[in-house]
């Protein structure tokens, strides 16, 4: 079952995630509602400890909620086993993180193709080159990571996420290790990918200026969404 074109591809209602810390209950998320659709770029803003990573882990099906309902691409997440959550992620989601996680002994093209190997899909170099072209790295395909700038390494990581043709791209603090110019270039790339591919792109950041380049901006504080605004991309 997949979400209909006009329906949310991610829908969360009263989403809560609590943890035990000794005798204390920590409310990492405390009642979050979200409707996220294909073809939009969404930023989740908030300081460290606000619940951004916890929320992203839930939206990514890397964790399950303590309470509330969460449906991803038509699949209810609550009550599923780790294997079942992996099935929801596989072929639906791509991930980009603050750290690039590129293998130093492989070329850029080979690093990108690792995602296909993990998903047990055939590797076609022409498809790899097309993805590298989209992220502006076609001329770096045979380079090793050590020959790239920080911004170029993050572009390679984005290409690796895109090669599996995800419907949803989750980026957790993707510009945290980049300078301001490179960070803005990455957000510009994200915007173009949303337009070209029609994907849902969810990005977390503590950088207000970058966050407002999205279509919609959600601000988290103490595990709650305290503000929803239109971004400059809307």
Task: Indicate residue ranges for each PLM-predicted region.
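ABC family nucleotide-binding domain
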Residues: 8-220
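Residue-level detector of flexible, active-site-proximal loop/helix-junction positions
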Residues: 84, 224, 232
């Amino acid at each position: 079952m997949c979400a209909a074109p006009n329906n949310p591809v991610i829908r969360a209602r009263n989403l809560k995630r609590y943890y035990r810390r000794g005798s204390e209950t920590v409310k990492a998320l405390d009642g979050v509602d979200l409707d996220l659709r294909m073809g939009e770029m969404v930023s989740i803003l908030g300081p460290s400890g606000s619940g951004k990573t916890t929320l992203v882990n839930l939206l990514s099906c890397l964790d399950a909620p303590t309470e509330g309902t969460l449906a991803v691409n038509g699949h209810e997440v609550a009550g599923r086993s780790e294997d079942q959550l992996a099935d929801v992620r596989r072929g639906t989601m791509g991930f980009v993180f603050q750290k690039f996680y590129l293998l130093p002994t492989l070329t850029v093209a080979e690093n990108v193709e690792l995602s296909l190997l993990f998903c047990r899909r055939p590797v076609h170099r022409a498809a790899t080159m097309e993805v590298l072209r989209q992220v502006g790295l076609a001329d770096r395909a045979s380079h090793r990571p050590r020959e790239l700038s920080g911004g170029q390494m993050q572009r390679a990581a984005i290409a690796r996420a895109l090669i599996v043709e995800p419907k949803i791209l989750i980026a957790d603090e993707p510009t945290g290790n980049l300078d301001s110019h490179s960070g803005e270039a990455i957000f510009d790339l994200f915007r173009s990918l949303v337009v070209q591919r029609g994907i849902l792109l969810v990005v977390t950041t503590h950088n207000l200026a970058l966050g407002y380049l999205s279509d919609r901006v959600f601000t988290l504080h103490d595990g709650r969404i305290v503000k929803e605004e239109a971004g400059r991309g809307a």
